[in-house]
Amino acid sequence: MLRIIDTETCGLQGGIVEIASVDVIDGKIVNPMSHLVRPDRPISPQAMAIHRITEAMVADKPWIEDVIPHYYGSEWYVAHNASFDRRVLPEMPGEWICTMKLARRLWPGIKYSNMALYKTRKLNVQTPPGLHHHRALYDCYITAALLIDIMNTSGWTAEQMADITGRPSLMTTFTFGKYRGKAVSDVAERDPGYLRWLFNNLDSMSPELRLTLKHYLENT
């Protein structure tokens, strides 16, 4: 059993307003569960515009610490961009699998958001009525369908997927600096000096950024 987890937050720094999960058992999506959560900070206008969860909707809801035990009980937790959910959630007693990292490994060069992959891979999944993209349970169904597709295509076991998740992977776009939002491959072609400057001057960098810069500097 693999448990797909999704959170909606007050912003990029965290503050959970909703958590949901579904389980994938024998290729089927089962056991849906979701909770609205009282956050530890105000919801940013930008986040509210995306998930449409308001302060009034969560004002009387339980804290995440009171809700999270409902989501224990799996050896494997799965999320799309799992590093984010893992960072904002309390410690979960299991191994993590990231479908975004798996998709990057399996299908290089395509867009990796869960909805982009849903469309590109032509996934067929029945989402919950009354919900929409960027509600936690809705996104769990999309990620679960993606996970099933990844497993059917690759033949990877949970152990292999967790191993891939734990390794650095190439970044596809810059998330900072003057080329924020631009494809790394395009920047490497147009301005390789910028990559060289980053590699030589950043005091600290993530393993993914180091791997990406080294890859493009050695191959362009």
Swiss-Prot record:
It comes from Escherichia coli (strain K12). GO terms for cellular component: cytosol. One of its GO terms (molecular function) is 3'-5' exonuclease activity. The lineage of its organism: Bacteria, Pseudomonadati, Pseudomonadota, Gammaproteobacteria, Enterobacterales. Its cofactor is Mg(2+). InterPro entries: Exonuclease_RNaseT/DNA_pol3 (IPR013520), ExoX-like_C (IPR046768), RNaseH-like_sf (IPR012337), RNaseH_sf (IPR036397). Its EC number is 3.1.11.-. One of its GO terms (biological process) is DNA replication proofreading. Keywords: DNA damage, DNA repair, Exonuclease, Hydrolase, Magnesium, Nuclease. This is Exodeoxyribonuclease 10. Capable of degrading both single-strand and double-strand DNA with 3' to 5' polarity. Has higher affinity for ssDNA ends than for dsDNA.
